């Protein structure tokens, strides 16, 4: 039997305009023969099993947190595997778990995806969080690549072993690179005028930029607008708009257990 809501959709598929809301259930056996095929297609679509998702990353926000938030926004469950860094570098890195030898990876019914921004782009399309059209999707990808550059800049500076070079690299990142990119984000938001980076609704471009700024300035906390953003009015208003999205706010208030502090 098919429930009331699905039956209304089914009546459109079978072009039976005389069907009313009183027809709340139907047996496949009772349908005319010519309607069985679209009915079968409909049933397959609505009963298709959700893929099994397994995300593997270190116990950090880092490059996986935007993926976690994307799952939260979509309301989709996934296995969040927190990989012990020592075990990764001594055993797992060359075990074949990750084809690229890097994390994060996302397993989708056994198929392994690598590169965090490619994973985000895939999930956005799956969860209706991608912008409309190829041009807007390219704009979203561009913003994701900007964030990837910021992450790389911070990671390289933070991981520098020479103390003087590390201090210089971190100073350049915090005083020059990040403010410059915040100015870039400000210009895009001011030009769009719809409250989000692309179009009129939340997309993965908003998620990836927000996650980086929240992780860098607020260490993943749910509190209000970071001081470092307050000189950018459009960016500040956008940050608060995204932060207070119910599912994002809930995720920020309930971070993954086992996280260790990191630069972002």
Features from the language model and the residues they span:
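Short, Lys/Arg-enriched N-terminal segments with co-localized hydrophobic residues
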Residues: 25-49
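GST-like domain detector, emphasizing the conserved glutathione-binding G-site
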Residues: 46-172, 176-182, 191-193, 197, ...
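Surface-exposed helix-capping loop/turn segments at secondary-structure junctions
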Residues: 129, 187-200, 222, 245-252
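GST superfamily/GST-like fold recognition
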Residues: 140, 197-223, 231-236
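Carbohydrate-binding/catalytic loop surfaces
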Residues: 164-167, 256-264
């Amino acid at each position: 039997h098919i429930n009331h809501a699905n039956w209304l959709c089914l009546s459109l598929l079978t072009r039976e305009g005389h069907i009313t809301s009183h027809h709340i259930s139907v047996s496949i056996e009772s349908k005319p023969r010519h309607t069985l095929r679209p009915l079968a297609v409909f049933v397959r679509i609505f009963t298709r099993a959700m893929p099994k998702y397994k995300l593997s990353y270190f116990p950090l926000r880092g490059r996986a947190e935007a993926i976690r938030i994307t799952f939260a926004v979509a309301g989709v469950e996934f296995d969040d595997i927190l990989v012990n860094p020592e075990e990764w570098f001594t055993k797992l890195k060359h075990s074949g778990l990750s084809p690229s030898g890097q994390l994060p990876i996302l397993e989708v019914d056994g198929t392994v995806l690598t590169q965090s921004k490619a994973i985000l782009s895939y999930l956005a399309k799956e969860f209706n969080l991608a912008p409309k059209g190829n041009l807007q999707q390219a704009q979203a990808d561009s913003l994701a690549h900007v964030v990837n550059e910021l992450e790389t800049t911070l990671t390289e500076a933070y991981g520098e072993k020479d103390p003087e070079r590390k201090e210089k690299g971190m100073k350049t990142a915090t005083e020059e690179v990040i403010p410059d990119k915040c100015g870039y984000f400000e210009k895009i938001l001011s030009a769009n005028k719809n409250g989000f980076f692309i179009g009129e609704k939340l997309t993965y471009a908003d998620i990836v930029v927000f996650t980086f700024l929240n992780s860098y300035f607020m260490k993943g906390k749910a509190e209000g607008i970071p001081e470092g953003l307050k000189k950018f009015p459009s960016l500040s208003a956008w940050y608060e708009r995204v932060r207070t999205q119910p599912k994002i706010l809930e995720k920020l208030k309930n971070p993954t257990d086992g996280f260790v502090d990191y630069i972002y």
